[in-house]
């Protein structure tokens, strides 16, 4: 059985580089977008890997949409890189930010539980959650 990865938020820089790494390790890679048919996936094109990935349209704020893609893909690994990534915009649009990050993560976790997916889950966050750590890098003691 091959390693299958599902990347929520594949169209961003981190998603593209993660997809490239997983492909180099022999993974079958699936990625999501709100509208996979219309999305440009410019980062994936630039890396020359867009045609090696299977794309799925998913509305992460909709549980059924999230559940459907997990049932179709049956991944061994799930990566959540989706959501609002601009700190400034997160303060301007707090409700949308909450929905795009917290509710989406809950939907992914609940869908994994619902289908009894025996998979690894990785949830990306922002270094902004640590605040100002001074001149030192953030670590477990910060």
Give names to the regions the model predicted:
Residues 1-142:
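N-terminal Rossmann-like NAD(P)+-binding domain of SDR-like oxidoreductases, especially those catalyzing
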């Amino acid at each position: 059985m091959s390693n299958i990865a599902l990347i929520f938020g594949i169209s961003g820089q981190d998603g593209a580089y993660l997809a490239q790494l997983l492909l180099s390790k022999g993974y079958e890679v699936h990625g999501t977008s709100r509208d996979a048919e219309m999305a440009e996936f410019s980062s994936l094109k630039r890396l020359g890997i867009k045609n090696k990935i299977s794309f799925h349209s998913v509305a992460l704020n909709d549980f059924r949409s999230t559940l459907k893609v997990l049932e179709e893909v049956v991944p061994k690994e799930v990566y959540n890189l989706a959501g609002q990534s601009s700190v400034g915009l997160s303060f301007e649009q707090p409700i949308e930010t909450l929905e795009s990050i917290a509710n989406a993560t809950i939907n992914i976790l609940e869908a994994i539980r619902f289908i009894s997916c025996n998979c690894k889950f990785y949830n990306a966050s922002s270094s902004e959650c640590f605040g100002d750590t001074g001149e030192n890098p953030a670590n477990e003691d910060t």
